[in-house]
UniProtKB/Swiss-Prot annotation:
Listed name of the protein: Ribulose bisphosphate carboxylase large chain
Site (Transition state stabilizer): K334
Propeptide segment residues: 1-2
Enzyme Commission numbers on file: 4.1.1.39
Processing after translation: The disulfide bond which can form in the large chain dimeric partners within the hexadecamer appears to be associated with oxidative stress and protein turnover.
HAMAP family: RuBisCO_L_type1
Length: 473
């Protein structure tokens, strides 16, 4: 036996497999202010104790592997390992537990959402000892937050750029989402902006297809913006989707948007990736562009209740990576979203400091230490009858986006925009006068429609529209 082998054996190295909980389950651990804290919903396989399952998550998302390795002796596991420090059963669910894991900050590269997610939600989600695993929430320490730029501008700077205060902003996604020529697309943009909307939007899958190349779309939309601004005296914008197949092409499109003098561009941050998104956010801050973020693909990740990742985690990641707007659900439209849970992550997007509140899905107190806020965007199956509820639920710091609810107006695009603007102004005025939007909302809309034929026509078209499907899961 060589001296080296004898030395290693003498310090206690023993090859083989041992339970994760012996090393990674530490219920006496006191979390540090610099730790990243994670709350996982864990569903162990039959026969796997919850402590072992929670420890396995901590191990496989930090320093652990399936067997003991001799190179463990070359570093300090106590310094670098993740720790499962608390486990609690999920009320009303069989064999589901919330496992709380603390990660030392040294495990993560500064300013990199990509690296953070590669560790915390990487290979561990395919681990055989778990039937299902869901990341419910993260506590990002202030020391780590300060390594990120965050949103290019934030809520207050955006309002100052647009000179719009005291109300939600209004938007519209141009439909049909695919198939229009650039000129017809620009015409729809102009009509909606002229009618009273603040923004129009590329749909998330509008990039640079054969029927409408990106440069042509950018040019016709810029023309529409300038014409609408001249006629209305208001600052207008269109979310020009810069998402592309490469980061270089994405930046090239953003550069062209800046050269046209438009105020805002757009990115699909999940399909485009966090590295690309952070690069674009940095470019937007340096060059005075606002950045609208679409969350296409989020439901693949967040819709299952016991596996994947809750959108509040994706929302926190977006605030770190950078974006001035992000889609957040509506509570009232065609897309899924529970009111209290949705408002929980809306507050995580906008506010500087958010207290732990399990009733709203917030597992940890979060301090954003001066990182700018993000405007939540309510979009998907909403129309004028929803305006009172949306105004009450989301408040002033939001974007209310009506696609079909604008372009589906029987008189055309501009009257559809007029109807939405009148409905919004009526709701804001009623709220400022002390009226109860939740109780008097329909009456407020009916009163406003008496002096707005465009709103009256919209009210008639969408009076019976509902999106109610029984939930089977």
């Amino acid at each position: 036996m060589s001296p080296q082998t004898e030395t290693k054996a003498s310090v206690g190295f023993k090859a083989g497999v041992k339970d994760y909980k012996l090393t990674y389950y530490t219920p006496d651990y006191q979390t540090k202010d610099t730790d990243i804290l994670a709350a996982f919903r864990v569903t162990p396989q039959p026969g796997v104790p919850p402590e072992e399952a929670g420890a396995a998550v901590a191990a496989e998302s930090s320093t652990g592997t399936w067997t003991t390795v001799w190179t463990d002796g070359l570093t300090s596991l106590d310094r670098y390992k993740g720790r499962c420090y608390h486990i609690e059963p999920v009320a009303g669910e069989e064999n589901q537990f919330i496992a709380y894991v603390a990660y030392p900050l040294d495990l993560f590269e500064e300013g990199s959402v990509t690296n953070m997610f590669t560790s915390i939600v990487g290979n561990v989600f395919g681990f055989k000892a778990l039937r299902a695993l869901r990341l419910e929430d993260l506590r990002i320490p202030t020391a780590y937050i300060k390594t990120f730029q965050g949103p290019p501008h934030g809520i207050q700077v955006e309002r100052d750029k647009l000179n719009k205060y005291g109300r939600p902003l209004l938007g519209c996604t141009i439909k049909p989402k695919l198939g229009l020529s650039a000129k017809n697309y620009g015409r729809a943009v102009y009509e909606c902006l002229r009618g009273g909307l603040d923004f129009t939007k590329d749909d998330e899958n509008v990039n640079s297809q054969p029927f409408m190349r990106w440069r042509d779309r950018f040019l016709f939309c810029a023309e529409a913006i300038y014409k609408a601004q001249a006629e209305t005296g208001e600052i207008k914008g269109h979310y020009l989707n810069a998402t592309a197949g490469t980061c270089e092409e994405m930046i090239k499109r953003a550069v062209f948007a800046r050269e046209l003098g438009v105020p805002i561009v757009m990115h699909d941050y999940l399909t485009g990736g966090f590295t690309a998104n952070t690069s674009l956010a940095h470019y937007c801050r340096d060059n005075g562009l606002l950045l609208h973020i679409h969350r296409a693909m989020h439901a693949v990740i967040d819709r299952q209740k016991n596996h994947g990742m809750h959108f509040r985690v994706l929302a926190k990641a977006l605030r770190l990576s950078g974006g001035d707007h992000v889609h957040s659900g509506t509570v009232v439209g065609k897309l899924e979203g529970e009111r209290e849970i949705t408002l929980g992550f809306v507050d995580l997007l906008r506010d500087d400091f958010i207290e732990k509140d399990r009733s709203r899905g917030i597992y940890f107190t979060q301090d954003w230490v001066s990182l700018p806020g993000v405007l939540p965007v309510a979009s998907g199956g909403i129309h004028v009858w929803h305006m009172p509820a949306l105004t009450e639920i989301f408040g002033d710091d939001s974007v209310l986006q009506f696609g079909g609810g604008t372009l589906g107006h029987p008189w055309g695009n501009a009257p559809g925009a007029v109807a939405n603007r009148v409905a919004l102004e009526a709701c804001v005025q009623a709220r400022n006068e002390g009226r109860d939007l939740a109780r008097e909302g329909n009456e407020i809309i009916r009163e406003a429609s008496k002096w707005s034929p465009e709103l009256a026509a919209a009210c008639e078209v969408w009076k019976e529209i509902k999106f109610e499907f029984p939930a089977m899961d």
